[in-house]
């Protein structure tokens, strides 16, 4: 089976799940899958995907896994006690051929947020690995190793980049579990202190790597339905995060409503309270310049703040960003697909996004065209109006 541990997922799933347990235990949600890569036929693999998901739903946390989570400073004992009883339930997920045809499949996850939040990452990893093990039966690992060595060589070649560190954010779109582990071992050996950590909790535990992550888009999206007022939903989400973590895990995600709306809400209080922010769509150079200026305008020294970049990075882009911003702020880089699925084959652009919470539509208004997903065009238009965003919905909206 592909997934053999419930820790084989991103850390931010657990940090968000703890907030859900303590503050939103009754919330119900709906997620949907989308493959953005045109011409991909996933229908022949539905039975394999279902079998892997069935196996996923049989997993439980082991005592050693629970002990590991308990040792993380921000994980609370009652959350670990809850996880000791937890398992994913197959009744909350359906996988069917899409009525649209064209080889598309529908994956719908629907149920209590607390009991569905851990589906996304392993299900995406399953879809990816099932697809590639059927379409690339003899993977060119030699090519993959060569490309990985070149990346390590490039990052380590110049002394002025000695403090430039990267982290692995590639679980969801990895070529395979076996390849993911080899990549991590190679990065550990080849980069040394320039390898900052991984978002994958299982490999963080088994390879003694620093686990990394705070919040994802789904958390701030859900707050559209959970907060007192839609216009205040981003502020509400950040305040509830601070209430749970009291200054820990202080990286705010900036692109749920776009950078303009984020900067309006990210006032002096949040500038001082949060350690930094994460970029995940739009022009990263423009984003960094605007955020640094925003900190200065709010009487915060940007050199004390962390700018995290995680949108479709490769090593040359990391180095360009580092060269632009080094010395002006603290920097962190999360590299995903370019590390864990670069063997010479076209990676699948697959996502699972929250589309409803408590029966109400929720949406992300990304800084990048094509990244938004919403099944309700009227709500998307209303959301843009509320947050003062003038650009029209992108092609993914309402699909």
From Swiss-Prot:
It catalyses: nicotinate + 5-phospho-alpha-D-ribose 1-diphosphate + ATP + H2O = nicotinate beta-D-ribonucleotide + ADP + phosphate + diphosphate. The modification Phosphohistidine is found at residue 217. Keywords: Ligase, Phosphoprotein, Pyridine nucleotide biosynthesis. The gene is pncB. It is an enzyme of class 6 (ligase). GO terms for cellular component: cytosol. This is Nicotinate phosphoribosyltransferase. It comes from Burkholderia mallei (strain ATCC 23344). GO terms for molecular function: nicotinate phosphoribosyltransferase activity. The keyword S-adenosyl-L-methionine does not apply. InterPro entries: N/Namide_PRibTrfase, NAPRTase_N, Nic_PRibTrfase, Nic_PRibTrfase-Fam, Nicotinate_pribotase-like_C. Pathway: Cofactor biosynthesis; NAD(+) biosynthesis; nicotinate D-ribonucleotide from nicotinate: step 1/1. Transiently phosphorylated on a His residue during the reaction cycle. Phosphorylation strongly increases the affinity for substrates and increases the rate of nicotinate D-ribonucleotide production. Dephosphorylation regenerates the low-affinity form of the enzyme, leading to product release.
